[in-house]
UniProtKB/Swiss-Prot annotation:
Entry's Gene Ontology molecular function annotations: ATP binding; proton-transporting ATP synthase activity, rotational mechanism
Species: Dictyoglomus thermophilum (strain ATCC 35947 / DSM 3960 / H-6-12)
Name of this protein: V-type ATP synthase beta chain
Function comment: Produces ATP from ADP in the presence of a proton gradient across the membrane. The V-type beta chain is a regulatory subunit.
Gene: atpB
UniProt-listed HAMAP family: ATP_synth_B_arch
Amino acid sequence: MPKEYTSVSKISGPLVLVENIENVKYGEVVEVKLANGEIRQGQVLEAQEGAALVQMFASTQDLSLKGMRVKFLGHVLEINLSPEILGRTFDGLGRPRDGGPEIIPQKRMDINGSPINPYSRAYPQEFIQTGISAIDGMNTIVRGQKIPIFSGAGLPHATLAAQIARQARLLNEEEKFAVVFGAMGITFEEANFFIENFKNTGALERTVLFINLANDPVIERIATPRFALTAAEYLAFDLDMHVLVILSDMTNYAEALREVSASRKEVPGRRGYPGYLYTDLATLYERAGRIRGKKGSITLLPILTMPEDDRTHPIPDLTGYITEGQIFLSRELHRRGIYPPIDVLQSLSRLMRGGIGEGRTRKDHGDLSNQLYAAYSRGLEAKELAVVLGEAALTEEDVQFLEFAEAFEMEFIKQGEYENRSIFETLDLGWKLLRRLPRSSLKRIRPEYLDEFWGKEDAS
């Protein structure tokens, strides 16, 4: 039976120091009983011989050293799991916040998990359809990939996250698909937006939500993505489901990590973030993937807002080293009313080539994507030239590419919040736009694909 200690010697911010203790381990769950009988929970942040530093899951402003009793429970944070978690909404510590009953566990799992052994990984190859052309056509996501969305303050990343969670599916409808959504440090209005959005569209029945609000304890914010990923591991590797995990906003997570680090008086790293920020992010991101011999998979889509739109900021910078590409949201496109404002030239999916082509999407997908990139890039160059020298300085072909770039933004990138395009609709739309250009300028597409999809009757 766990011992109770009354040897609390110091309370500093969210931290409580307990001395004269024994057999306490890092990450252990703690119960703190106040003089009035109220019980609060915490977690061991640091354990040394005879002492432990405890991070509380609630405010410590009204705590007093007098009458406090501390009990170390002998286990780390765990989550109750069963198939019943689908369709449920939990707080950042895995407690129901939807008014439903507690989960009767078929399994309890340590939320810290462990990254997948590189030797056991299977290479991600199968296509995931999001219904968004700028992603499916140009920056394809495959099962088991980890690819972040780099956004900025005021950009519609929350709307985009909800749309992806709502529309994402496999082309093979027979396979089981689920979404785990972990929200960190969001406002009540944002939380209500996600919950109502999923309820009203029927997406909630295949979704698990973990929501940490901005006024919830900081330590809970650090635990939230771990609860979400542990739930995803259960669905993927125990129930053989293909799981898309969306974590928003990782910037709030990193800020919480910095706050806890400052409370512990650790030596700060870049811009005040702890020196272990890279390692900590890797322990989250590397839990995504596929495992040989397992049917399920975890695909990770972390969303982060870049402070001051600075892509060299430590959070996006370190994230880029771990993940397999990125999707950039453009403030310029957003100003012009284009949703989703995805900057396809700045975005990249490093695993795209393995997930497209015949048998996965369509045989012309790779060539079409290359040609759209090249034509859009040339159109933007023509646009810059027209700004400096005037449109009169452009050749006839330059004008065609300029018009193509404008049409590409308004018809291909831009789409409705509830518009769900199939991959075949996206590819056909790409061909439709390319018909604005002379066939002779489409040098990135094989002749046989031009004959089949561009159309000989459209040749010029």
